[in-house]
């Protein structure tokens, strides 16, 4: 069974009533739209956010903030993820090769999360205070 082969049981989904096919059909002439008015016309209904002519809420409220480009180039890596690597020196190149960060990342910060069992050597990465103490307590080193 695949998602693209699923279909409802025969007869469980009645077909849509066709409109404008004579008085006897129950939906002839005005096709269920009543007489005159904007909603009876072709293409005739207001936009999704139209509020009857008053100033819409998305224009009444001020614009706020922006998305920092800086945030898109920095990433966090946990000690638990670094423990799985078996490289001698862990730097940006090693993290890219391991698939922990993508090519757009220019800077990485190591955070204290997960379990570290062996000493590791970091090069050119930012490190939090907690992660620094955990690495140094196991005999690891950090080069700036």
UniProtKB/Swiss-Prot annotation:
Xref: Gene3D superfamilies: 3.100.10.10
SUPFAM superfamilies referenced in this protein's UniProt entry, alphabetically: Ribosomal proteins L15p and L18e
One CC-aspect GO term: cytosolic large ribosomal subunit
InterPro entries, A to Z: Ribosomal_uL15, Ribosomal_uL15/eL18, Ribosomal_uL15/eL18_sf, Ribosomal_uL15_bac-type, Ribosomal_uL15_CS
Pfam families according to UniProt: Ribosomal_L27A
Annotated segments matching region Disordered: 1-45
Keyword Iron-sulfur tagged: no
Comp. bias (Gly residues): 21-31
Keywords: Ribonucleoprotein, Ribosomal protein, RNA-binding, rRNA-binding
PROSITE patterns recorded: RIBOSOMAL_L15
A molecular function GO annotation: rRNA binding
BP terms from Gene Ontology: translation
Quaternary structure and partners: Part of the 50S ribosomal subunit.
Family according to the record: Belongs to the universal ribosomal protein uL15 family.
Role noted for this protein: Binds to the 23S rRNA.
Protein name: Large ribosomal subunit protein uL15
Taxonomic lineage: Bacteria, Pseudomonadati, Pseudomonadota, Gammaproteobacteria, Legionellales
């Amino acid at each position: 069974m695949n998602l693209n082969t699923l279909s409802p049981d025969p007869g469980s989904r009645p077909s849509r009533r066709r409109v404008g096919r004579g008085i006897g059909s129950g939906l002839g002439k005005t096709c269920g739209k009543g007489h005159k008015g904007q909603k009876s016309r072709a293409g005739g209904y207001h936009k999704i956010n139209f509020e009857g002519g008053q100033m819409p809420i998305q224009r009444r409220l001020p614009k706020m903030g922006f998305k920092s480009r800086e945030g898109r180039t920095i990433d966090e890596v946990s000690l638990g993820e670094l423990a799985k690597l078996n490289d001698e020196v862990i730097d940006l190149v090693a993290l890219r090769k391991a698939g922990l960060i993508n090519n757009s990342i220019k800077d990485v910060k190591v955070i204290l999360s997960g379990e570290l069992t062996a000493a590791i050597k970091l090069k050119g990465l930012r490190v939090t205070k907690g992660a620094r103490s955990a690495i140094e307590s196991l005999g690891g080193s950090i080069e700036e």
